[in-house]
Amino acid sequence: MTKTEFEATVEFDDGSTADLEMAADKSWDSFLNYFGDAQHVYCVTYSQSPAFIYKMFQNQDLAVDSLEVIVGDNQHDDYRRSLKNTNNAKKIAAQLESLRQDGDLLIHTVDSARVLLHTKLYIVENQDGSRTLICGSANLSKQAWQGSKQTNVNIAWRTDGD
């Protein structure tokens, strides 16, 4: 359930505007409301879960064509292990690999020996050309959403894309 705490329209010096919303999201489904008309999603996240990436592409209410993710932690081996412990692990791995080969899924990692990137930022390009920028506390991971008492606070800016 999304609980909107604040809404406003912001006008910039050039006259363009963006709708601003600050919200508390307690569930993955409420967070997915930001991605309803998404065509392309660019994401910087501290942690991610292969199963959640798979869910984004499989969700019947979304039309995500591509996802590009920069992962800022150093838990790559843990992701492999967590995927092995997932129902349908082979199916998920095969689907993600197919998406990667088709160019629809790109996952970048940082050199974690030098830096950890703790940012959570999503740029959503919608099918109508509008864009949504989300900045907040929500990781693209199972831990961020399932069985957690954590509330993710996000700020979203929506523009017409120009």
Label each residue range with its predicted role:
Residues M1-D162:
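PLD/PLD-like phosphodiesterase catalytic module centered on the HKD motif
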